[in-house]
UniProtKB/Swiss-Prot annotation:
<comment type="similarity">
    <text>Belongs to the pseudouridine synthase TruB family. Type 1 subfamily.</text>
</comment>
<comment type="function">
    <text>Responsible for synthesis of pseudouridine from uracil-55 in the psi GC loop of transfer RNAs.</text>
</comment>
<keyword id="KW-0819">tRNA processing</keyword>
<dbReference type="Pfam" id="PF09157">
    <property type="entry name" value="TruB-C_2"/>
</dbReference>
<dbReference type="GO" id="GO:0003723">
    <property type="term" value="F:RNA binding"/>
</dbReference>
<dbReference type="InterPro" id="IPR015947">
    <property type="entry name" value="PUA-like_sf"/>
</dbReference>
<dbReference type="InterPro" id="IPR002501">
    <property type="entry name" value="PsdUridine_synth_N"/>
</dbReference>
<dbReference type="GO" id="GO:1990481">
    <property type="term" value="P:mRNA pseudouridine synthesis"/>
</dbReference>
<protein>
    <recommendedName>
        <fullName>tRNA pseudouridine synthase B</fullName>
        <ecNumber>5.4.99.25</ecNumber>
    </recommendedName>
</protein>
<dbReference type="GO" id="GO:0031119">
    <property type="term" value="P:tRNA pseudouridine synthesis"/>
</dbReference>
<dbReference type="InterPro" id="IPR036974">
    <property type="entry name" value="PUA_sf"/>
</dbReference>
<dbReference type="InterPro" id="IPR014780">
    <property type="entry name" value="tRNA_psdUridine_synth_TruB"/>
</dbReference>
<dbReference type="InterPro" id="IPR015240">
    <property type="entry name" value="tRNA_sdUridine_synth_fam1_C"/>
</dbReference>
<keyword id="KW-0413">Isomerase</keyword>
<dbReference type="GO" id="GO:0160148">
    <property type="term" value="F:tRNA pseudouridine(55) synthase activity"/>
</dbReference>
<dbReference type="Pfam" id="PF01509">
    <property type="entry name" value="TruB_N"/>
</dbReference>
<feature type="active site" description="Nucleophile">
    <location>
        <position position="38"/>
    </location>
</feature>
Length: 293
């Protein structure tokens, strides 16, 4: 078996938990995931199985979330799973005020990741250092947020904001919740998070582990074809002789102006051969997925 699974991760599971479970269910060792999802988050977790694990690096990096920000609360983890640092009612905060602050979180921004995160500093993961009580300065990183759209606003002592966020890889929604609360000096934390899109996969087409197990038992499960997850890349077809040479590591001259990574197919069979890179009209092998003899 090889290809991708659009998994709907359940609450409380780590991304590694899902991979470990799938290895047992599929009886495969080669299982990997794209884009770590926090245990408290649910939603799309792209899974690669078999040789498709080699294609994870080529998946598009865009992501989308539905997030709930709770104002008046600040926690150690920047979500409700951590210890409460401060809790102060802020009933006077209005949606109109919050809306005026949202534009500063859109575009390329400097973001300090949560101290409880998988990012490595000096070779050590931040969450390991945080659990040991070690205080370390976390450097800011440049991330990109494409849009933030308000979905709902609930008033109260601890008002909540529902937003839809589209962003690039490496963006921490927990950090946005924290920093948005800091703007109003109320504190803010992430109360809920659903990933609705990741690396070309959508929540509407996803499978839970229970769904997958049911399909496996019925013998109806088919993974998403490896190349179907890479439709963001343009494609190139090669005749048999050129395809064979390319699969053997040779560069192929093509009269094409396209520059960058492409999907490569054999013209006669439409078999997906792998990923190449076009530079100055030359197709260079990057990853041969299906060699031909």
């Amino acid at each position: 078996m090889q290809g991708f699974i659009n998994l709907n991760k359940q609450f409380g599971w780590t991304s590694h938990d899902c991979v470990a479970r799938l290895r047992k269910m599929l009886r495969l060792k080669r299982v990997g995931h794209a884009g770590t999802l926090d245990p408290a988050a649910t939603g799309v977790l792209p899974i690669a199985v078999g040789k498709a694990t080699r294609l994870l690096q080529y998946l598009p990096s865009d992501k989308a979330y539905k997030a709930t920000v709770r104002f008046g609360v600040q926690t150690t983890t920047d979500d409700l799973q951590g210890e409460i640092i401060t809790s102060q009612p802020c009933r006077g905060l209005s949606l109109s005020e919050v809306k005026t602050a949202l534009p500063q979180f859109i575009g390329k921004i400097e973001q300090i990741p949560p101290i409880y995160s998988a990012i490595q500093v000096e070779g050590k993961r931040l969450y390991d250092l945080a659990r040991k009580g070690e205080i370390i300065e976390v450097p800011a990183r440049t991330v990109e947020v494409f849009s933030i759209d308000v979905l709902d606003w609930r008033e109260g002592d601890f008002p909540e904001l529902d937003v839809a966020i589209a962003c690039g890889s490496g963006t921490y929604i927990r950090a946005i919740a924290r920093d948005l609360g800091a703007v109003f000096h109320t504190g803010g934390t992430l109360a809920a998070l659903i990933r609705t899109h990741s690396s070309g996969f959508n929540l509407t087409d996803s499978l839970t582990l229970t769904d997958l197990e049911t399909q496996l038992q019925a013998g109806t499960f088919e993974p998403t074809p490896a190349d179907a997850a890479l439709q963001c890349l343009p494609s190139v077809t090669l005749p048999s002789i050129s395809a064979q040479k390319w699969c053997q590591g040779q560069r192929i001259e093509l009269n094409l102006e396209t520059i960058g990574k492409v999907r490569v197919y054999q013209a006669e069979t439409n078999i997906f051969l792998g990923i190449g890179e076009l530079q100055a009209g030359v197709l260079i092998p990057q990853m041969v997925f299906e060699p031909i003899s």
